[in-house]
Amino acid sequence: MKVEYHTVYLKKRFPLRISRGVFEGSDNLYISLTENGHTGWGEMAPGGTEGAETAAAGQAMLEQFCATGLSASIHDTWQNAHAAGVAPCALAALDMALWDLRAKQAGVPLYALLGLARRAVVSSVTVGINPPDVVRERVPLLLARGARALKIKLGSPEGIEADQAMFAAVFEAAQGSGAVLRVDANGGWSLKDARRMMGWLAEHDVEYIEQPLVRGAEDQLPDLFKDRAMPIFVDESCRMSGDIATFFQSVDGVNLKLMKCGGITEALRIVATARAFGLKTMIGCMGESSVSIAAGASIGALFDYIDLDSHLNLDPDPATGAPFENGITLPADQPGHGGVLSHA
């Protein structure tokens, strides 16, 4: 098997500000696996909490592992790489490339290889933390592009008054569009502020709240859950399937990301575990292009909610394979997951 790596800088069209900081772009790592005329593609968006802060660090881990650790079984490869300490975001790139290759060798779309339907689920499109006047200009642009659900980032360092002012601007700009409104605080609230904001947001028809409390404050979730004004999803608090048992009684759902969990193989386990505990499921993304978004869309039929939109905020997207049509990030209807790095 031929293994190749490419590092590409992904510049965001609009810098994304969340509770933890501002993100303008990233050097993402791409891996291609070629065997018998077929090539599988994978992508890593680096991150400190995902185990590799740079593309170079991720590539070094993968080069060392791929020299001896690849197995005919994708599941065995995942377990071996995880045990060897390969960072989740780097493992995600390898894992999705292996699944892409396997589906191409079988001559079927990845969703079909996994026994899934090509189900169309509306994807959230993110509105980052911004002053109200910026939001009033940006929301119409997202709606014009076809967005039917908006995920509004709150948890502003300026406090919940700033959150309310920004949300009010989104609410005003989206009036009459029919767009569903969802909120992600990225752990930016205290328990007191979360209670207050959830009650206020419920009055404005918000569908759910994501990660209201900071990761590490899961012991406060039971207090928030018992009087919740809307469904609670956790994101940063859920990285692997084994995490779910620690908080399943205090949330309504979990948001997994391929970069957090190490790819499709573990994502399938997270979904199965969440379902066993009676939880809803969501798949999200980080600063990823169409390669990783296409991989996520391939398993989209498993999820109640989808948040696969980061490729829409790239200037340019160096990859293809994740079309956004009528508010839906569609899985590829061709062999593999469909994502390909088109220019490096």
Curated annotation (Swiss-Prot):
Chain positions recorded as substrate binding sites: T126, K151, I152, K153, K257, D307, L308, D309
GO BP annotations, alphabetical order: amino acid catabolic process; peptide metabolic process
Keywords: Isomerase, Magnesium, Metal-binding
The protein's Enzyme Commission number: 5.1.1.-
Pfam families with a match to the protein in the record: MR_MLE_C (PF13378), MR_MLE_N (PF02746)
GO molecular function: magnesium ion binding; racemase and epimerase activity; racemase and epimerase activity, acting on amino acids and derivatives
Cofactor note: Binds 1 Mg(2+) ion per subunit.
InterPro entries: DgoD-like (IPR034593), Dipeptide_epimerase (IPR034603), Enolase-like_C_sf (IPR036849), Enolase-like_N (IPR029017), Enolase_C-like (IPR029065), Mandel_Rmase/mucon_lact_enz_CS (IPR018110), Mandelate_racemase_C (IPR013342), Mandelate_racemase_N_dom (IPR013341)
Highest taxon of source: Bacteria
Cofactor(s) listed: Mg(2+)
Protein residues bound to Mg(2+): D184, E210, D235
Note: Part of a large, functionally divergent protein family. Protein modeling and substrate docking was used to predict the substrate specificity, prior to biochemical analysis.
Family to which the UniProt record says this protein belongs: Belongs to the mandelate racemase/muconate lactonizing enzyme family.
Role: Dipeptide epimerase with a preference for hydrophobic substrates. Catalyzes the epimerization of L-Ala-L-Thr, L-Ala-L-Met, L-Ala-L-His, L-Ala-L-Phe, L-Ala-L-Tyr, L-Ala-L-Trp, L-Ile-L-Ala, L-Ile-L-Ser, L-Ile-L-Met, L-Ile-L-His, L-Ile-L-Phe, L-Ile-L-Tyr, L-Ile-L-Trp, L-Phe-L-Met, L-Phe-L-His, L-Phe-L-Phe, L-Phe-L-Tyr, L-Phe-L-Trp, L-Phe-L-Ser, L-Phe-L-Thr and L-Phe-L-Lys (in vitro).
Identification of the protein by name: Hydrophobic dipeptide epimerase
